[in-house]
Amino acid sequence: MNNTKKLSTNVIVFGALMTALVVILQLMGAFIKFGMFSVSLVLIPIVIGAAVCGSGIGAWLGLVFGAVVLLSGDAGAFLAVNVPGTIITVLLKGVACGFFAGAVYRLVEKYNRYAAVIAAAIVCPLVNTGIFLLGCRLFFMDTVAAWAAAEDFGDNAVRYMFFVLAGGNFLFELCLNIVISPIIFRLLNIRKKQG
């Protein structure tokens, strides 16, 4: 019983630390922009939290990420068009990227912890960007088409979505996560040795 209580306390404390880190990094990331949007530096603590504490904490950290995006004004261009669509897209992409990072980590960890870290680090930005693009398609396609036409993409709004709205951010986030993966792996090894 005492081990369960200790584990729960450790998970809560670690989750709280990762939550604070998500808030700080998302606010700092607002100063680094590719196109219209700031980069998501928070995907790293989301992956760490999901790997250490599981999909539930990963989903929580993603929810916090989404809430900070909405409250910081980073989603302002979309909020001006469709408030419910923006809230659904932003919160869902955050929760899902954290949840799936944790799920993939747990699935692959059985075979190789290093591969699990890399897989989670890849899945996190992939899910985040994928749901963002799906949200653009479902809720904002007319607006995206107008933006595409204004940027000389003609009637090719999908190409605009991939190359302007998501492209630079996705590549930055994916590369950063992959480069940081060995550090995440070392942190997890230290955590396993202590626990």
Positions of the model-derived regions?
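Alpha-helical transmembrane segments and their cytosolic interface
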Residues: 1-19, 107, 138, 152-195
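Hydrophobic transmembrane alpha-helices
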Residues: 1-60
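Hydrophobic alpha-helical transmembrane segments
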Residues: 12-16, 44, 58-63, 87-92, ...
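Interfacial aromatic-anchored transmembrane helix boundaries in multi-pass membrane proteins
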Residues: 25-39, 64-104
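Membrane-interfacial segments
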Residues: 29-33, 37, 76, 104, ...
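Mid-bilayer segments of alpha-helical transmembrane spans in multi-pass integral membrane proteins
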Residues: 91, 95, 99, 103, ...
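Internal alpha-helical transmembrane segments of multi-pass membrane proteins
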Residues: 107-130, 195
